[in-house]
Amino acid sequence: MEAKDQKKHRKKNSGPKAAKKKKRLLQDLQLGDEEDARKRNPKAFAVQSAVRMARSFHRTQDLKTKKHHIPVVDRTPLEPPPIVVVVMGPPKVGKSTLIQCLIRNFTRQKLTEIRGPVTIVSGKKRRLTIIECGCDINMMIDLAKVADLVLMLIDASFGFEMETFEFLNICQVHGFPKIMGVLTHLDSFKHNKQLKKTKKRLKHRFWTEVYPGAKLFYLSGMVHGEYQNQEIHNLGRFITVMKFRPLTWQTSHPYILADRMEDLTNPEDIRTNIKCDRKVSLYGYLRGAHLKNKSQIHMPGVGDFAVSDISFLPDPCALPEQQKKRCLNEKEKLVYAPLSGVGGVLYDKDAVYVDLGGSHVFQDEVGPTHELVQSLISTHSTIDAKMASSRVTLFSDSKPLGSEDIDNQGLMMPKEEKQMDLNTGRMRRKAIFGDEDESGDSDDEEDDEMSEDDGLENGSSDEEAEEEENAEMTDQYMAVKGIKRRKLELEEDSEMDLPAFADSDDDLERSSAEEGEAEEADESSEEEDCTAGEKGISGSKAAGEGSKAGLSPANCQSDRVNLEKSLLMKKAALPTFDSGHCTAEEVFASEDESEESSSLSAEEEDSENEEAIRKKLSKPSQVSSGQKLGPQNFIDETSDIENLLKEEEDYKEENNDSKETSGALKWKEDLSRKAAEAFLRQQQAAPNLRKLIYGTVTEDNEEEDDDTLEELGGLFRVNQPDRECKHKADSLDCSRFLVEAPHDWDLEEVMNSIRDCFVTGKWEDDKDAAKVLAEDEELYGDFEDLETGDVHKGKSGPNTQNEDIEKEVKEEIDPDEEESAKKKHLDKKRKLKEMFDAEYDEGESTYFDDLKGEMQKQAQLNRAEFEDQDDEARVQYEGFRPGMYVRIEIENVPCEFVQNFDPHYPIILGGLGNSEGNVGYVQMRLKKHRWYKKILKSRDPIIFSVGWRRFQTIPLYYIEDHNGRQRLLKYTPQHMHCGAAFWGPITPQGTGFLAIQSVSGIMPDFRIAATGVVLDLDKSIKIVKKLKLTGFPYKIFKNTSFIKGMFNSALEVAKFEGAVIRTVSGIRGQIKKALRAPEGAFRASFEDKLLMSDIVFMRTWYPVSIPAFYNPVTSLLKPVGEKDTWSGMRTTGQLRLAHGVRLKANKDSLYKPILRQKKHFNSLHIPKALQKALPFKNKPKTQAKAGKVPKDRRRPAVIREPHERKILALLDALSTVHSQKMKKAKEQRHLHNKEHFRAKQKEEEEKLKRQKDLRKKLFRIQGQKERRNQKSSLKGAEGQLQ
């Protein structure tokens, strides 16, 4: 066996190491490098062939020019929005697995379910928004319009599927993004050779569809259900470093790929009408162009909307800090996917929502109280209304009684009677009813039962019933300091009014929560309420609810024993009503605090009450936005504060009666506090002049705001907006000067009165700038401003003319001239520099370089325009710029969008231009797709995808003739363009579109029916169709004929006088005059005389109107799982098929077999004179006619006798039998020979086998003999040697 030659070592001939060796070798040989050789011997390096050099130069220039793209202005912001990466492919090809692996590669996190877009940080300056695209044609169209990069997954074991080619065609129409193919299922190939062939075949087919050299990535196999880490890492590096060219539609329109949706509709409106339009807020990164507030947007699959409000939020997936580093740390590897439930933090415009993982809302099962509350919430009318409309029948034959028939004496409110408790020494307030003395023990039990029932009924009553009860109670005991407390309630109610104009639903919720807190404070201040501590806990749990549970008098009587404890708990619970939103831990903590506070001394309670009063006084009174501040309101406010102070003093005196000693001088106590309160009352009574003149006084309360900010877990602060911001729109505009008696400024005396208020007016001598400058001594000589080029000359002395001084002052004052001079100087310097560069610079700059330089300058100007301003100011000027994370509020959204929301389908908000929201006539150039099997018919409804929209319309197809006529086509032509006109949304010219017959379900064949581009947007097009009018001649003269059957009246003939007519045979004519009889007949003149069999026709053109039908595709409003089943108007053929209506065929339109008569041609007759003149070869060869055979040469017919016929028949039968026997014998002989051949072959094989064995035996014996002979010869040789 020969050994294989080892592969020889090949020396490295390139690279830095080889270059060093070569240089060292040349130095050793004292030859030097190539540059030295060029200097030493330039002729050796001269041009050998000018033609070859020109060819190489042209080739290099061609290669350079091929790489050029038309430069565009770089409009990408400093913090660009995330790159949209669409992972597209057929079902079961590995899309979700690839997304999970990419997310794990970049963020080290694993997502269990991918729903909606997922935003991740992939590098120091790049973020990615990855979204999955299914095989629904609606989703494919929408994502192709916003994609920056498409990862097209291809099952290598199956090959290309139809969805791949459909998506490629969609991308070609709507602006071609970057496309990278990814081959999966490569581990299914067993043989490496087959794998290589498949890769090559798929790569070249992919290059045909995209462009030669398009990147095709290979994922070889899976390990534990995931792709290999190194391959995913390489794919991620390709995505991270990829460059993107801006697409025209995306850069000219703002758009948002929403990653979060929230319903802001009032729950009460939803409860009363579940089908009401919704108000939703959508969140996402703004891409494309700048977006202005209140602009028009289109949501594909839903419809057109106007932006109600837009605001920018902090970036939830911000780029890492701008510092030099080689890689990202673990904290900076962010992922943000709200629809997938990842991140845990949701950003709103005035709050940050943190997901605590369900630790604070754990509940084993829903209790019966929860079901009761839900049943109360679901009612559409209040219980009072139901009770008022209800009737009860006491007896079978009695009249039904209503609520108005019942005496209201039983519902009287209790009266208050103060009694001194001898055991405790405190004043107690007893509730006495009118019939208490008359009722007995049995009645008390019934009253207790009735009071319990009333308590249940009142527990479900609304606010209005409760306020009426409170008003009646205050009327009953006005003598016991109820008036002041009622004033306090009214004041707090006015403070807690809802704002007239809320910025958002969050403000409404906050205001409702404050109203709930105010009601709780009122309830806790009334001493007849029961168990104030429990009330505080329940109020803190359900702050802001519209209705509170009412209390019956019986409950108050039963709980009067614990009144002292409830009062102490109420005082401790009052300061805790700052926020109605608290958790269960906070509730238990408040209960513990209330128990601890019951043991406080009276002095501590007084100090706490003082602090509460001071806090309430320090807060500015909240006035509704529709209310104006005036002096009367100011006085009422101060009087209410005084009443509050007096009432609080009386309240403390009543509580401290049992603790103070009798006869003590109360006026000496707390003199410092009383003095402070008196000073405070004096300050409140003094009018605030600044507030009266300028309106609302905005003071700097940063320190107070910092103190009042609440912290959540020490991590986040609750961002509460300034309350005064909501009332700024309705406050007094102090910048507007209201003129009651305008001055006549044309009068000289009026102008002189304000002349000294302006710079150009006449000033006093000591204040006049010109005179002061004239008096200055000459300190400096002439000097020139090198920056602006202005020359300033010093004045010679104080006697210089005043005109020169005034001129110089004007030059210094005028900023426009200074700016223009500076600009001229800079232009002059720039031109000088360009001249210097053109003369002395060696590197020649091409036109392409100059164009790129201009684009870079424009990009720098665009960035520097608003660079120094903050975001809020920039938004007012240029709108919301791309890269911002914005929150958009949209009103009047169909309820199905919220109810049938599916996060797997993308929500895109596409901004519309000024005229793109209108609907009109659109003309376009269309071509039926070569892969679509059917042809398209005019007036058949079809779905177009133009711009952001997908809609159904009825187009008319036409073609332009050579004379400019737009002729209607019934069907689209094959393999060529035609025109199409339809009624639809206005779209800019040059926008691509595609047409689909249906978006419902999966069609078996290619779904894209046609593609094209928008041409024109006006109604000037006039589409006509051909109409042939036929008639018949009934009188024929020489060149004149009377024609009938073409028209119905003489008026129609008059309309067409002078029109050109023609016969089927081609004779042209003209219509002359109408005839009296028959009706519609006319006289016409022709080129030639007609025949009665001729048919006369006139070709006319009839204008066709374009159907005004526009139906947007609302696929996102369909239920979940049915979003790919949207169907609009059906075609005529579909309707016939659905209803089983067969088309009645027109007999004249049917194809009939062509019956042609066979023509018999006569023989060619050549005259004899011509035959003589013809040459011999062309002369007809005449042969003599065959004569009749003579009778003697004719053979007579043999007629056999019957006996002979029998013998002949017998011989035929015998010959047939003999031939049959011979055939059978031949077959048997063939079989015998075959068997004999087989036997001989078998014997031959056995013979060969025996011979082979015999040969082996002979050769073996012969070999043994030779070995023995060889051994014997070796032994003999050894013996001789010895």
UniProtKB/Swiss-Prot annotation:
Presence of keyword Cytoplasm = no
| Alphabetical list of SMART domains matching this protein | AARP2CN, DUF663
List where Low complexity composition bias occurs.
535-550
Q: How does it assemble?
A: Part of the small subunit (SSU) processome, composed of more than 70 proteins and the RNA chaperone small nucleolar RNA (snoRNA) U3. Interacts with RCL1.
UniProt lineage: Eukaryota, Metazoa, Chordata, Craniata, Vertebrata
NADP listed as a keyword: no
Recorded GO CC terms: chromosome; nucleolus; nucleoplasm; small-subunit processome
**Protein name according to UniProt:** Ribosome biogenesis protein BMS1 homolog
What organism does this protein naturally occur in?
A: Homo sapiens (Human)
User: Region entry G5: which residue ranges?
Assistant: 219-228
| Bms1-type G domain boundaries | 80-245
Query: Positions of the region G2?
Result: 117-121
**Task of the protein:** GTPase required for the synthesis of 40S ribosomal subunits and for processing of pre-ribosomal RNA (pre-rRNA) at sites A0, A1, and A2. Controls access of pre-rRNA intermediates to RCL1 during ribosome biogenesis by binding RCL1 in a GTP-dependent manner, and delivering it to pre-ribosomes. GTP-binding and/or GTP hydrolysis may induce conformational rearrangements within the BMS1-RCL1 complex allowing the interaction of RCL1 with its RNA substrate. Required for RCL1 import into the nucleus.
Amino acid composition bias (Acidic residues), ranges on this chain: 434-472, 503-531, 588-610
The listed locations are: Nucleus, Nucleolus
**Family, as annotated:** Belongs to the TRAFAC class translation factor GTPase superfamily. Bms1-like GTPase family. BMS1 subfamily.
**Gene that specifies this protein:** BMS1
Pfam families documented for this protein: AARP2CN, RIBIOP_C
